[in-house]
Amino acid sequence: MNIIHEELNKLGIACDSFSILQDKDGVTVARIVSGEKSYVVKCFQKDEHKREIGNYQLLVSLGVPTIRVIASTDSALLLEDIDCSPTYRLGIEEDMSDPEVGRRIAVWYKLLHSRGYGYVCQSGESMYDEADFFTLENIACIKEKTGSQDAPAWVLLEQNYAAINELLCKARRTITYNDFYYTNMVVAKDKSSALMFVYNLLGKGYAYTDVRNVLSSLSEEAGKAFLDEYGEFDPIEKALDDVVSVVVTLHLACQRDEFPWWAQALLDELNTTFIEKIENMRRVL
């Protein structure tokens, strides 16, 4: 593919062969063989995806572990090939039920959040923030696109929107990963450490968004291990997230051509537990 050869030329990498790992939504990922070495090159055709290049640089500057970046251009990253690493392996589905892995990834998230508070306070004004999607306009669009206009929960939410949004704006922000799943995880072969990679959705937010994101994918036992290692979270953030995350996730789902399966449970929740979550939020206000 032309884009791969163009970026490799910029990087000064001779390519003996390559195989495409991903080619979707303007992001092309390929494994490159150059002599006796193997790399992974990630090429970005859209500006909104190019922020991942800067996000790698940001995490390195903060001392948050990432996979190794060999080189970069303004449109591509040349990364170590984890499949050839003597130390690490890519995450597997079984990791989601492994308490040891749960503990190790908690260490990474705790470091990300602790280092992120200061950075966001000083330099995070323009960072991606999923909470920006919590608007009355987006709520109206969700109702229309999902045909859920008659759900009583929407009335209760709109009545309390101003107070909830005020608390949301005041919530302390840190760097948040926003994209947890085993396919985005790297684990040490001896399980001594673990880290996340793929940083396109990295942004700012309150820390509990990541905690919820991780716990939703881990088994109960692995989740308990994660929380034991991560430590306490702010219960007000949880109450806030219980409401805001439903709107944000449904908004993102409604941007798809077809409504995704992973958002169906939240749509069903509009007529069940969502009202209870809003009522709980009202008690916090």
PLM ranges: what are they?
Residues R103, N213, E221, D228-L285:
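Helix-rich C-terminal or lid/interface subdomains of diverse kinases
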Residues N2-N9, Y117-N178, A188, L270-V284:
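An alpha-helical support segment within catalytic cores of ATP-dependent transferases
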Residues V27, V33-Q122:
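ATP-binding pocket architecture of kinase catalytic cores
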Residues M1-S72, C169, A188-A194, R283-L285:
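Conserved NTP-binding catalytic cores of kinases and kinase-like/nucleotidyltransferase enzymes
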Residues A14-F18, D150-W154, F233-D241:
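Short, surface-exposed acidic
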Residues I175, A188-E229, P235:
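Active-site Asp-x-Gly
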Residues K42-C43, Y177-N178, V198:
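Short beta-strand segments
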